[in-house]
Curated annotation (Swiss-Prot), chain A:
GO terms for biological process: glycine decarboxylation via glycine cleavage system; nucleoside metabolic process. The glycine cleavage system is composed of four proteins: P, T, L and H. In this organism, the P 'protein' is a heterodimer of two subunits. InterPro entries: GcvPA (IPR023010), GDC-P_N (IPR049315), GDC_P (IPR020581), PyrdxlP-dep_Trfase (IPR015424), PyrdxlP-dep_Trfase_major (IPR015421), PyrdxlP-dep_Trfase_small (IPR015422). One of its GO terms (molecular function) is glycine dehydrogenase (decarboxylating) activity. The glycine cleavage system catalyzes the degradation of glycine. The P protein binds the alpha-amino group of glycine through its pyridoxal phosphate cofactor; CO(2) is released and the remaining methylamine moiety is then transferred to the lipoamide cofactor of the H protein. It catalyses: N(6)-[(R)-lipoyl]-L-lysyl-[glycine-cleavage complex H protein] + glycine + H(+) = N(6)-[(R)-S(8)-aminomethyldihydrolipoyl]-L-lysyl-[glycine-cleavage complex H protein] + CO2. Disulfide bonds: none annotated. This is Probable glycine dehydrogenase (decarboxylating) subunit 1. Keywords: Oxidoreductase. It comes from the Bacteria. Its EC number is 1.4.4.2.
């Protein structure tokens, strides 16, 4: 089988039509010193069987949550996924990451997105949610841009308790438009309210915080909302949706825009993606929200129907003026989240959150009681907590891996002042036996 | 197509009513008719500067979103909230209740470059 579609004869005809002698002439505008001038350093092809075997051996080098007991979180979580999620997801009528280009024909997809938006609104306590975004970090950055557009201001305050990689993404997004970023100091694992007050000014478009934050600690959103609003700034909250099963919703606490990573909602850990960003806001900011929305309406005969709205700004005529580059979509991941939420149900979702809370509390108590380990802060946490260790985190993790345990995140790389501290995560999937095993192994290491 | 004779026009389908040093700006009957049902209007704030031939706002209809281009340069001294609160007013009364902004002109000679009603009529019939 030929994989290169053009025959020599076809190439000759094309060149003749273009009145050039050979293909090289087509590239003559590129200076020769910039051209590769040699063959690519890749080997010849493999047969399908050889390739499959090669890929399998590469895949075998990975360590996944199926082979290990995972206490690693920090933005990517090992939650239980009901098996029905993947079966519904792989139905061919749903199986695309795109929202449809002839949207109104695809009523089923539109309805699923409408349900998704409705669930995100319920979870976050916001009025409107868009049809989804790339991931939590880019959704947060887009929310910062949106807040600047709403307030017509050009500075944002970012909590240093926010995921360090999310902060990097925010910096990248805000660099182009020249928006100033100021970071809020933390104390006892929480954003320092006094520092927020000090840094908030009439130029500040928004305060960005995470809830629960990167350390698993639960920020006082109500207080931060008051501070932000007093200066005319918006409160942007980046949430772990699972936590919203038991925590007061950001909307109830006064948030204006809520974003987050939806991976926890039925999307597997798969080397970092594809993930799901969600974004919701108060009604009055709806028009400044990037992306599109699926709306519910009735047709001329009064029958229920769904429509894709707010897409013209981004997709068609005004693309150059769009505040965001969200022109593709994570519809399949949004569908996974929708199916997950509908399967676990309101009560089940609350139970997942409660199990995370209880199991984390149990692990925290067991680990802190071990010699050589202590809790740096007494702040309430949800599904993650920081543990100070005597032995180097790197050594600890290497030892744990020998026992098939994925340990916590070494915080020193992100927060130099927290060298010798680890971030552990306990989801509802961890059993009592596994938590006790972790404690036993850690006890043996120190 | 209604093209009131006392107004000036741009090729981007805005109309301008001159009152002393001030220009009242809206979009034409033809523009609203071509856009279809208008669902959203975004306008600048009082005090903002607008630049001739540069976008100053957006009208969004069920089928498209279009920029509004300033016919003259100057400072926005008044903004009509009605198109923002009830965008359909632009469809219903483009030359009246659907007006958009009033600008204090910085260079009134720019008016000379605008089209007369006859010229605009010829443009939309072309």
């Amino acid at each position: 089988m030929k994989f290169i579609p053009h025959t020599d004869e076809e190439r000759r005809q094309m060149l003749k039509h273009l009145a050039v002698e050979n293909t090289d002439q087509l590239f003559k505008d590129i200076p020769s010193e910039l051209r590769l001038n040699r063959d690519l350093a890749v080997e010849g092809g493999l047969s399908e069987m050889e390739l499959q075997s090669h890929m399998n051996s590469l895949a075998g080098l990975n360590t996944g949550v199926d082979q290990t007991i995972c206490f690693l979180g920090a933005g990517a979580y090992d939650h239980y996924i009901p098996s029905a999620v993947k079966h519904i997801l792989s139905r061919s009528e749903f199986y695309t990451a795109y929202t449809p280009y002839q949207p109104e024909i695809s009523q089923g997809v539109l309805q699923s997105i409408f349900e998704y938006q409705s669930m995100i609104c319920l979870l976050t306590g916001m009025d409107a949610a868009n049809a989804s975004m790339y991931d939590g970090a880019s959704a947060l950055a887009e929310a910062a841009l949106m807040a600047c557009a709403v307030t017509r201001r050009d500075k944002v305050l970012v909590a240093s308790t926010l995921h360090p990689e999310y902060r990097e993404v925010v910096k990248t997004y805000l660099h182009g438009p020249g928006i100033e970023i100021s970071e809020i100091a933390y104390q006892e694992g929480l954003s320092q309210l006094a520092d927020i007050d000090q840094k908030l000014d009439k130029k500040t478009a928004a305060v960005l915080v995470q809830y629960p934050n990167f350390f698993g600690c639960i920020e006082d959103l109500g207080k931060i909302a008051e501070q932000a609003h007093a200066k005319g700034a918006l409160l942007v909250v980046c949430v772990d949706p699972i936590a919203l099963g038991i925590l007061k919703s950001p909307g109830q606490c006064g948030a204006d825009i809520v974003v987050g990573e939806g991976q926890s909602l039925g999307i597997p850990l798969s080397y970092g993606g594809p993930y799901l960003g969600f974004m919701a806001c108060k009604d009055k900011y709806l028009r400044k929200m990037p992306g599109r929305i699926v709306g519910q309406t009735v047709d001329v005969e009064g029958r229920r129907g769904y429509v894709l709205t707010l897409q013209a700004r981004e997709q068609h005529i005004r693309r150059d003026k769009a505040t965001s580059n969200i022109c593709s979509n994570q519809a399949l991941c949004a569908l996974a989240a929708t199916v997950y939420l509908s399967l676990v149900g309101r009560q089940g979702f609350k139970q997942v959150a409660e199990l995370c809370l209880q199991k984390t509390a149990y692990a925290k108590e067991l680990l802190a009681a071990l010699p050589g380990y202590q809790l740096p802060w007494q702040t309430p946490v949800f599904k993650e907590f920081v543990l100070k260790t005597k032995e180097a985190p790197e050594v600890i993790n290497r030892e744990l891996l020998k026992e098939n345990i994925l340990g916590g995140l070494d915080l020193g790389g992100y927060y130099p002042e927290l060298a010798g501290h680890m971030l552990f995560c306990v989801t509802e999937k961890r059993s009592r036996r596994e938590i006790e095993l972790l404690a036993a192994r850690l006890g043996a290491i120190s | 197509m209604k093209v009131p004779s006392e107004l000036k026009y741009t090729k981007e389908h805005e109309w301008v009513k001159i009152e002393g040093n001030r220009a009242i700006i809206g979009i034409t009957y033809y523009a609203q008719d071509s856009l279809g049902d208008i669902v959203f209007v975004e306008l600048p704030s009082v005090g903002d500067a607008v630049e001739v031939e540069e976008p100053f706002g957006v009208v969004e209809s069920v089928k498209t979103a279009s920029d509004l281009y300033a016919p003259v340069s100057g400072q926005v001294v008044e903004v009509n909230n009605e198109p923002m609160d009830s965008p359909e007013v632009v469809n219903q009364d483009p030359y009246g209740q659907g007006w958009m902004i009033m600008v204090e002109m910085s260079d009134p000679s720019q008016i000379e470059k605008l089209m007369s009603a006859e010229e605009y009529q010829a443009l939309i019939e072309a």
